[in-house]
């Protein structure tokens, strides 16, 4: 029972993090480089928490390019992600993270000729079909929201990062992997300071960052709690079960978003009209089923 509770805590806390992301993207910072810079800066401040579990080890320069790529992806996937949060409802954008579950087996097929089963192909089709339905605003004129393509790019980057992370963890311990990838993420984001116009905007918004630091800190805290809960659940439950539970995250975003809408209005980018709630809920259930089939 504790493992099951932990497995559901992961999508719950990550849903809260997604809603905070939407708030930061739509209401706090107008320029994405500024938002990403301060977000990564907060992540770096939180990185030393991993030292509670042990100290990072030095494994030589050979592994560093791989960890550098992991760190760079951790920065650049945020660009299409935050832009998507500005173009679509938060719960729908989060649902499109499920595209990553599709991309991993597809990449495996293309790169190492790993065959997919009929059930996996069916799951792939269900996820894509449900994602397309989420885009339909006018049944007479089907038009794909640009947020879908942005999340497709973001999911592709995260899928590549997951494969690289898995490869790195076969050679080094997880503490070192987390520490060095966070270090490279910070070095990458400091590159944002090179263009003068971006540097000036980051400097001009530093007082606002200090004022909103508690929001960034809360976001990092709930995100880390969700990640730890997922790791704990994976130690006791099958990975397929945990990942399937994780795919319910859009439902948590929708539920929390509806509650926040009732309290604060549409400050968190979520359409909670009856028709949209029903359509989203049905599509999210199908996406969850599709993820379970692909895994």
Model-inferred region functions:
Residues 1-88, 136-152, 183-236, 259-285, ...:
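Membrane-interface interhelical linkers
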Residues 1-4, 52-62, 107-119, 166-176, ...:
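Helix-coil boundary and interhelical linker segments in multi-pass alpha-helical membrane proteins
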Residues 9, 37-38, 96-99, 119-122, ...:
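Hydrophobic core positions of alpha-helical segments in small-molecule transporters
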Residues 13, 17, 73-80, 100-107, ...:
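Membrane-embedded alpha-helical core segments of multi-pass
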Residues 27-34, 80-96, 115, 170-177, ...:
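Structural motif at transmembrane-helix junctions in multi-pass transporters
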Residues 40-44, 98-102, 124-127, 131, ...:
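Residue-level recognition of pore/gate-forming positions within transmembrane alpha-helices
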Residues 81, 100-122, 132, 236, ...:
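C-terminal transmembrane-helix exit sites in multi-pass transporters
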Residues 146-176:
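Selected transmembrane alpha-helices and immediately adjacent juxtamembrane segments
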């Amino acid at each position: 029972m504790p493992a099951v509770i932990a497995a559901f805590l992961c999508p719950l806390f990550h849903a809260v993090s997604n809603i905070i992301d939407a708030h930061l993207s739509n209401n706090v910072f107008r320029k994405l480089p500024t938002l990403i810079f301060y977000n990564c800066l907060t992540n770096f401040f939180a990185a030393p928490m991993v030292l509670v579990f042990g100290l990072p080890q030095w494994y030589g320069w050979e592994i560093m390019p791989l960890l550098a790529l992991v760190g760079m992806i951790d920065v650049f996937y945020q660009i299409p992600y935050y832009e998507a949060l500005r173009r679509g409802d938060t719960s729908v954008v989060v649902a499109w993270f499920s595209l990553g579950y599709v991309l991993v087996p597809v990449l495996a097929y293309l790169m190492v000729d790993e065959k997919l089963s009929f059930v996996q192909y069916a799951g792939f089709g269900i996820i894509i079909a449900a994602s397309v339905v989420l885009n339909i605003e006018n049944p007479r004129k089907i038009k794909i929201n640009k947020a879908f393509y942005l999340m497709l790019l973001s999911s592709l980057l995260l899928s590549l990062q997951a494969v690289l992370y898995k490869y790195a963890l076969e050679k080094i311990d997880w503490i070192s992997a987390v520490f060095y990838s966070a270090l490279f993420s910070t070095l990458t984001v400091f590159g944002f300071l090179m263009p003068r116009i971006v540097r000036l905007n980051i400097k001009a918004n530093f007082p606002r960052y200090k004022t909103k630091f508690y929001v960034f800190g809360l976001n990092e805290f709930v995100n880390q709690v969700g990640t730890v809960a997922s790791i704990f659940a994976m130690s006791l439950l099958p990975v397929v079960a945990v990942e399937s539970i994780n795919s319910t995250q859009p439902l948590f975003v929708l539920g929390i978003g509806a509650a926040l809408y009732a309290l604060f209005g549409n400050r968190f980018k979520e359409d909670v009209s009856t028709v949209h709630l029903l359509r989203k809920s049905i599509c999210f259930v199908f996406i969850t089923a599709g993820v379970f089939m692909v895994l």
